[in-house]
C-alpha cells in the first residue's frame, strides 16, 4: 500500500435494494495501467465514480495517493483527471474555449490556460479544429478533446471509464497511443473497459469484476495461464451443424466443447501438446460428416478467461456481455483461478478526521474566478444559440405589442385616470419576462447533468458553489440585458419613466432581483428532477397561472373576487405593482416591502437548498 496510487478496501455501494459494489479490494501501483474488466452493470463505473468523489460509498475505504475520497475529497480532486463513458465537453464552445475554460477552473492563470490549451490541441491533433464548436467534432475528436480536458494540470492519476466505447478502430488506436504515452510520463491510469483486447493491449494488471466484486486479478498472461493449456478452435462450414459438432467432439480433449464468438465456431480446452487432439477431432467430425473450414490450436485469450470465470462469452461486437447464469449469480469458475468469495459482514472502515479547508483570501479569489468562468460560459451559450436568443428577446416584445395594440383599448377603461396602458403594461411585462425565463435555468442545468458536464465540474478542484452561482449570475446578466432592450422598445411605442432616474434604476433592480430568486428555485428543481423535459413541464404548470393570475396585464380589481384574494399576495403581483410604482410614481411604493420580502425569503430558502442538493448528489 505504501507505493499504491489507488487503494480500495472492502468498498460497498448500494442503490436502494441493488448492491453495485459488494466489497471491492484493489491496489493500483503508481505509473501503471490497471484494467478493470467486466460486463455492463458489473460495477465498474460505480467504482470510478466513488474514486472520483462523485459518489460516497456506504462502507469500506478508498484512497488516492493516501487521501481519503470521502474525508479529503477536495484533496483527491487536486490529484485526478476523469474521462467518463461519454465525452463531457461543452458542445457550444469551441475546442480551444473548452480547454481554456477547464484550465481556468483548474486554477491556471488566463495566460497559462491559453498556453496549456494550445499544447494539448497540438498533442491531440486538434489544432486545425480548435476554433470550431465541439458539436461539429467526430466521435474520436470529442474523445480526444475530453481526454485533453483531463490533462490540463498533468494529474497524478487518471480514471478512464470505457474511453473507447463506440469509437471506430482508428480512433480507438489513437486513444491507446495516448494512454501509452501518459504512462511513460509517469501518470497512473485506472482503465475500465468492456473490450477484452483493450485490457490485453494496455493493462499491466487486470481485475475482472462481476456483480460488484472482483472475481479474479493478475497480469494478462497470468489470467490466461490459469485457463490452462491451449484452445482447440473449430470453424464449421455450416453454423446450423454446431450442435451436431458439439456432440461429435464430446469426450475429446480435457473439457466439453463450448460455443465460440461466432455461431459457426466451437472451442475446446486442449492439453499442452494438442497435435494428437487435432487428429482426433478431425476424425470425429469426418465420421459425423460435418464439414470444417478451419481447425487449429491457439493460446487462450482474455475472452476465454472471461468465459471460464463468468460462464458467458463476449458479445458479437467484441464487448463483454452480461455475465450471469440462470440463477443470476456469477458463472462457474475454474478451481485454479483465484476467485473472490462473498464478503463477510461489511463494516464501515475507520474514518480519519475530515480536513477542513479554511476560506483564505486566495481561496475566496479562486472561488470568485470559478463562478465568473462558469458565468461567461453560460452567457456564450445564450449568445450562440439563435433559437434561445430569439425566444428570450422576441417573445416578451411580442407580448408588449400584442397587449398594447390588441387588448389595450379594452383594458384601458379599468386603469386609473391619466395612466396609459403602455405605462401600466411594460413594468408588468418585465416581471412576466423574468418569470417565464426562470425555467431556462433548470433546462440548462438539466442538460449539463445529462451530458456529463456537471460530473466534470464536480470532479475538479473548483468551488462547489461555482456551478450554481455561475448559472444564476449569467441568468441575471441576461435578464438585465433583455429588460433594457424591452424598455427601449417601450420608449419607441410611448412608454416613459415618470419618477426619475433613481427610481427607474430601482425598478430594473427589483425586477432583476425577482428573476434571480426564481432562478435559484429552478436550480433546485433541476437538481431534483434532473430532466430538462420535467423541469420545463414544472415551469409551465407553476409559472403560467402565477403570471396570468396577477396584475401583470390587468388590474386585479377586474378579476373575480375569489381570484383577487390570491392575486393580492402573489409575489408576481407584489413585484409588478412595486415595479410599476417605481416607474411612474415618485416615492416609496406601498407594495415594495412585500416584494422585497418575497425576494429575500426565496433566496434565503432556495440558495441553501440548491447548494445542499448539489452536494447531496454524491
Which sequence ranges carry the predicted segments?
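ABC transporter nucleotide-binding domains
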Residues: 3-210, 216, 458-459, 464-473, ...
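Hydrophobic alpha-helical transmembrane segments of multi-pass membrane transport/permease proteins
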Residues: 384-410, 422-437, 544-546, 601
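Aromatic- and glycine-rich beta-strand/loop motifs that create alpha-glucan
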Residues: 4, 355-395
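Membrane-interfacial helix-loop-helix junctions in multi-pass membrane proteins
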Residues: 412, 498, 547-602
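Alpha-helical transmembrane segments and their short interhelical loops
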Residues: 464-539, 544, 589-611
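Junction motif at the cytosolic side of a transmembrane helix
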Residues: 337, 342, 346-351, 583-586, ...
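ABC-family P-loop ATPase nucleotide-binding domain
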Residues: 1-12, 312-368
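ABC transporter nucleotide-binding domain
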Residues: 176-271
Amino acid at each position: 500500500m505504501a507505493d499504491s496510487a489507488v487503494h480500495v478496501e472492502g468498498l460497498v455501494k448500494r442503490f436502494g435494494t441493488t448492491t453495485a459494489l459488494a466489497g471491492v479490494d484493489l491496489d493500483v501501483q503508481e505509473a501503471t495501467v490497471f484494467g478493470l474488466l467486466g460486463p455492463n452493470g458489473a460495477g465498474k463505473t460505480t467504482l470510478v465514480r466513488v474514486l472520483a468523489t462523485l459518489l460516497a460509498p456506504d462502507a469500506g475505504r478508498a484512497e488516492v495517493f493516501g487521501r481519503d475520497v470521502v474525508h479529503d475529497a477536495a484533496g483527491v480532486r487536486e490529484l485526478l483527471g476523469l474521462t467518463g463513458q461519454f465525452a463531457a465537453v461543452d458542445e457550444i464552445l469551441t475546442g480551444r474555449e473548452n480547454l481554456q475554460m477547464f484550465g481556468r477552473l483548474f486554477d491556471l492563470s488566463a495566460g497559462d490556460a491559453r498556453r496549456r490549451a494550445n499544447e494539448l490541441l497540438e498533442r491531440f491533433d486538434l489544432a486545425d479544429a480548435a476554433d470550431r464548436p465541439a458539436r461539429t467534432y467526430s466521435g474520436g475528436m470529442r474523445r480526444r478533446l475530453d481526454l485533453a480536458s483531463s490533462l490540463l494540470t498533468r494529474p497524478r492519476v487518471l480514471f478512464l471509464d470505457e474511453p473507447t466505447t463506440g469509437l471506430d478502430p482508428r480512433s480507438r488506436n489513437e486513444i491507446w497511443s495516448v494512454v501509452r504515452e501518459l504512462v511513460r510520463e509517469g501518470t497512473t491510469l485506472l482503465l475500465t473497459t468492456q473490450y477484452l483486447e483493450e485490457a490485453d493491449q494496455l493493462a499491466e494488471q487486470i481485475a475482472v469484476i462481476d456483480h460488484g466484486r472482483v472475481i479474479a486479478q493478475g497480469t494478462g498472461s497470468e489470467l490466461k495461464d490459469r485457463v490452462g493449456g491451449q484452445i482447440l478452435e473449430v470453424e464449421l462450414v455450416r453454423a446450423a451443424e454446431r450442435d451436431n459438432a458439439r456432440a461429435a467432439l464430446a469426450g475429446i480433449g480435457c473439457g466439453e466443447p463450448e460455443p465460440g464468438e461466432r455461431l459457426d465456431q466451437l472451442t475446446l480446452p486442449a492439453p499442452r501438446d494438442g497435435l494428437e487432439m487435432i487428429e482426433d477431432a478431425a476424425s470425429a467430425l469426418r465420421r459425423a460428416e460435418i464439414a470444417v473450414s478451419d481447425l487449429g490450436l491457439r493460446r487462450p485469450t482474455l475472452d476465454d478467461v472471461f468465459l471460464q470465470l463468468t460462464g458467458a462469452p463476449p458479445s458479437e461486437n467484441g464487448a463483454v456481455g452480461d455475465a450471469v447464469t440462470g440463477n443470476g449469480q456469477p458463472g462457474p469458475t475454474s478451481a485454479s483461478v483465484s476467485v473472490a468469495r462473498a464478503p463477510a459482514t461489511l463494516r464501515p472502515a475507520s474514518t480519519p478526521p475530515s480536513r477542513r479547508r479554511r476560506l483564505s483570501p486566495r481561496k475566496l479569489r479562486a472561488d470568485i474566478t470559478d463562478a465568473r468562468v462558469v458565468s461567461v460560459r453560460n452567457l456564450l451559450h445564450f449568445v450562440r444559440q439563435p433559437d434561445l436568443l430569439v425566444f428570450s428577446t422576441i417573445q416578451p416584445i411580442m407580448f408588449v405589442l400584442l397587449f398594447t395594440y390588441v387588448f389595450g383599448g379594452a383594458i384601458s377603461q379599468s386603469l386609473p385616470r391619466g395612466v396609459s396602458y403602455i405605462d401600466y403594461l411594460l413594468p408588468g411585462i418585465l416581471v412576466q419576462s423574468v418569470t417565464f425565463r426562470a425555467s431556462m435555468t433548470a433546462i440548462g442545468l438539466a442538460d449539463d447533468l445529462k451530458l456529463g458536464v456537471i460530473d466534470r465540474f464536480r470532479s475538479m478542484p473548483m468551488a462547489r458553489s461555482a456551478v450554481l452561482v455561475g448559472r444564476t449570475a449569467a441568468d441575471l446578466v441576461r435578464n438585465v440585458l433583455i429588460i433594457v432592450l424591452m424598455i427601449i422598445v417601450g420608449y419607441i411605442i410611448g412608454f416613459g419613466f415618470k419618477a426619475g432616474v433613481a427610481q427607474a434604476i430601482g425598478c430594473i433592480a427589483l425586477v432583476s432581483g425577482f428573476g434571480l430568486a426564481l432562478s435559484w428555485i429552478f436550480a433546485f428543481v433541476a437538481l431534483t428532477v434532473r430532466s430538462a423535459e420535467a423541469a420545463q413541464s414544472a415551469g409551465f404548470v407553476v409559472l403560467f397561472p402565477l403570471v396570468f393570475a396577477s396584475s401583470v396585464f390587468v388590474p386585479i380589481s377586474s378579476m373575480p373576487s375569489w381570484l383577487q384574494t390570491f392575486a393580492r399576495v402573489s409575489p408576481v403581483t407584489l413585484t409588478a405593482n412595486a415595479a410599476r410604482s417605481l416607474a411612474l410614481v415618485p416615492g416609496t411604493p406601498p407594495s415594495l416591502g412585500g416584494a422585497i420580502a418575497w425576494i429575500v425569503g426565496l433566496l434565503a430558502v432556495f440558495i441553501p437548498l440548491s447548494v445542499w442538493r448539489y452536494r447531496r448528489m454524491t
